[in-house]
Amino acid sequence: MARLVPLEKTRNIGIMAHIDAGKTTTTERILYYTGVTHKIGEVHEGAATMDWMEQEQERGITITSAATTCNWGDHRINIIDTPGHVDFTIEVERSLRVLDGAVAVFCSVGGVEPQSETVWRQADKYGVPRIAFVNKMDRVGADFFRGVSMIRDRLKANPVPIQLPIGAEDTFKGVVDLVEMKAIVWDEESLGAKFHVEEIPADLQELAQEYHEKMVEEISSHDDALMEKYLGGEELTVDEVRAAIRNATIAIQICPVICGSSFKNKGVQNLLDSVVEYLPSPVDIPAIKGVDADSGAEIERKAADSEPFAALAFKIMTDPFVGQLCFIRVYSGVLNSGSYVYNSTKGKKERIGRLLKMHANKREEIKEVLAGDIAAAVGLKYTTTGDTLCPEDAPVILESIEFPEPVIAIAIEPKTKADQEKLGISLQKLASEDPSFRVRTDEETGQTIISGMGELHLEIIVDRLMREFKVEANVGKPQVAYRETVTKKVKVEGKFVRQSGGRGQYGHVWIEMEPQEPGKGYEFVDAIKGGVVPREYIPAVDKGIQEAMDTGVLAGFPCVDFKVSLVDGSYHEVDSSEMAFKIAGSMAFKEAAAKASPVLLEPIMSVEVVVPEEYMGDVIGDLNSRRGRIMGMEGRAGAQVVSAMVPLAQMFGYATDLRSATQGRATYTMTFDHYEQVPKSVSEEIIAKVKG
């Protein structure tokens, strides 16, 4: 099948912003103007095409990133709508990973809001070129110029307005195009679909001239040939200006700024024009790098149909009609439906059942997907988010998507017996969709523990269990996984003897127990001389100790980081057995652990808080009050980064506390670092609580 749309006319873009800046509304309008929908879905009526999960329509926020395809002129645009809430940063990360460019939507009243900072930094991390769209120009308090200066000051970006608004609030009726130096005014009756071009209004001519000069000066500074022309006083042609804006945008030297009001249908067509004119096609960005699955050598895959096939799975979704959908971004080559591919990350073969082009929540079946495109595949059994798909004879592993470790865990239990079976299956399904959500069973209590990125994240998961899977569940309080260890060397005896008529039991050992370096784990050394304990019984002693160490002597937490040497013992010709030595081993462990000055260990988290200068003192004071140790501070893009080591037990509710202490402008990441001894006073409290 021939290509319908050439690669250079394909755009893979994301729409990113803070909650409520108008992301989903903007996407809806794009779909309306590109002729995909005939009726506009309003978010506040709960009918937006992109927000198709029930919770999204209720809460009016976007949780999963739906991928949609539309055409504008002779270009094809694949749009990924991303959520703006901090607990769903994982969704944003994974969509940015597979995009070529992005539209950052800002609210003309709120300007740069906290989540805009987070999302902007994520886009910097993946080197995604962006256009800024200052939305809601019709709102009371709308201020385009303040929005632009906030992008400069808060995001440390280089915003270059290529449009100016004509009017603001209820008088907002058009924009000045600074490239062509014309005014574009919308006709209200046509839902903003029609507009006419006229001369720039007299009261704006001076301002427009000033901003036109600024724009030309900025783009010339990145292009020597233009600089010469500009300094020589020559006029630049419209095409030269456009090409220069495009090059500087793709090189992330500037961020063009345009404005409009999606809700009032103003400026959306200009936004589409800008996407096509200034954002990169798959050909304009560097070829994707990966490693050869066999040799580990670095290889490149260029965006071309003739290259070997390579794609990255960036999202798994359960669809009520077709089952599991796997969204893939094809970087090179061609994939046909019904063909076999190789998942190089897992080392498994997969068959592609069907290929679908997604439109928010409608789907169109396609026969093949080509380089640079995004599609959903049905029928993949092993593939999860971040896996690479390729042919078996040209294996490559593309750089995967990094997922943060979950930081909050709660126990969950089914309300009824009937819910019990469904709970396990449903949780596994949800975990396959969302890599930042984990499920495990606590060995000691038998409880199911779910962990995720934050309180809202887990709330939505529990909510989805009820709605999609009809499972009723009770959830507990968040909890910490403690450990125990020993601090001095001891030698003890373990003796298990039962001899009262008939076959008896006889196991007898002497062990030495000593602490190991943190993180070394458990080590067993056989130091028996002269066969005082026969060979065949030695593994049984080891097994007995391993079984006993799962429940420590202090508070029943697993015991870690110690070494046991089996040094002596005795046996009985008839009565000795593996069982007897296993019991002797576990008895010896219990006695040794109690004598070797046992202590409690707690997980210490490495916490990084990105905080605006003015809240720094409060944040540091708060971390200190949580038994935290400040490890360092550094300035980064208009904010301070504070790194600290803090016990996990002190971090519950931190997201909420941090949000209120900094008006939501700080963000934090938390990853497990190591286990450390709990201070005596705290340890006594914990033990008392457990023994209750």
Curated annotation (Swiss-Prot):
It comes from the Bacteria. GO terms for molecular function: GTP binding; GTPase activity; translation elongation factor activity. PROSITE patterns: G_TR_1, G_TR_2. Keywords: Cytoplasm, Elongation factor, GTP-binding, Nucleotide-binding, Protein biosynthesis. InterPro entries: EFG_II, EFG_III, EFG_III/V, EFG_IV, EFG_V, EFG_V-like, EFTu-like_2, G_TR_CS. The keyword Cytoplasm applies. One of its GO terms (cellular component) is cytoplasm. GTP binds at residues 17-24, 81-85, 135-138. It is found in: Cytoplasm. Residues 8-283 form the tr-type G domain. GO terms for biological process: ribosome disassembly. The keyword Nucleotide-binding applies. Belongs to the TRAFAC class translation factor GTPase superfamily. Classic translation factor GTPase family. EF-G/EF-2 subfamily. Catalyzes the GTP-dependent ribosomal translocation step during translation elongation. During this step, the ribosome changes from the pre-translocational (PRE) to the post-translocational (POST) state as the newly formed A-site-bound peptidyl-tRNA and P-site-bound deacylated tRNA move to the P and E sites, respectively. Catalyzes the coordinated movement of the two tRNA molecules, the mRNA and conformational changes in the ribosome. This is Elongation factor G 1. It comes from Geobacter metallireducens (strain ATCC 53774 / DSM 7210 / GS-15). The gene is fusA1.
